């Protein structure tokens, strides 16, 4: 999926409002995913998955950092996320559907925290962005 100039602008503006909260939002999205889609917990058997867990917060920071990296490289997402794609495809072997589930939870989290900025256009742009990130992360599965 190709991001238009407007999409890129919307994504950068929305992520700019996330600011230093990317890790917290990532952790919240993970918690939403674990609650809404319990089968996703199987990829984290060694984690304490309770609310506020240090392990979920640490992984949420990784998610937030990866998305911040992606926002900074909207014109070269495959290059920016290549190592992460390798990790998830070859070492962790995460089922690709889980990226869609996490994307849904990220959109919900952003909508809750940025209600005035989460317009239909921004929602659509963020959805396209997260879909593109998911596609890049699963590209090495083939």
UniProtKB/Swiss-Prot annotation:
The keyword Metal-binding applies. GO terms for biological process: hydrogen peroxide catabolic process. The keyword Flavoprotein does not apply. It comes from the Eukaryota. Keywords: Heme, Iron, Metal-binding, Oxygen transport, Transport. Heme b binds at residue 88. GO terms for molecular function: haptoglobin binding; heme binding; iron ion binding; organic acid binding; oxygen binding; oxygen carrier activity; peroxidase activity. Coiled coil: none annotated. SUPFAM superfamilies: Globin-like (SSF46458). Gene3D superfamilies: Globins. CDD domains: Hb-alpha-like. InterPro entries: Globin, Globin-like_sf, Globin/Proto, Hemoglobin_a-typ, Hemoglobin_oxygen_transport, Hemoglobin_pi. Transmembrane segments: none annotated. Residues 2-142 form the Globin domain. Red blood cells. Belongs to the globin family. Heterotetramer of two alpha chains and two beta chains. Involved in oxygen transport from the lung to the various peripheral tissues. This is Hemoglobin subunit alpha-1. It comes from Equus quagga burchellii (Burchell's zebra).
């Amino acid at each position: 999926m190709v991001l238009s100039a407007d999409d890129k602008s919307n994504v950068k503006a929305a992520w700019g409002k996330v600011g230093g909260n990317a890790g917290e939002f990532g952790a919240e999205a993970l918690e939403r995913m674990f609650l809404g889609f319990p089968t996703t917990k199987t990829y984290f058997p060694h984690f304490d998955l309770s609310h506020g867990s240090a392990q979920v917060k640490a992984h949420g920071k990784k998610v937030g950092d990866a998305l911040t990296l992606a926002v900074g490289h909207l014109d070269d997402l495959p290059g920016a996320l290549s190592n992460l794609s390798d990790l998830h495809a070859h070492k962790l072997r995460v089922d690709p559907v889980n990226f869609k589930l996490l994307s849904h939870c990220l959109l919900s989290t952003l909508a809750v925290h940025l209600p005035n900025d989460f317009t239909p256009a921004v929602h659509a742009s963020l959805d396209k962005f997260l879909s593109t990130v998911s596609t890049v992360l699963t590209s090495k599965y083939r």
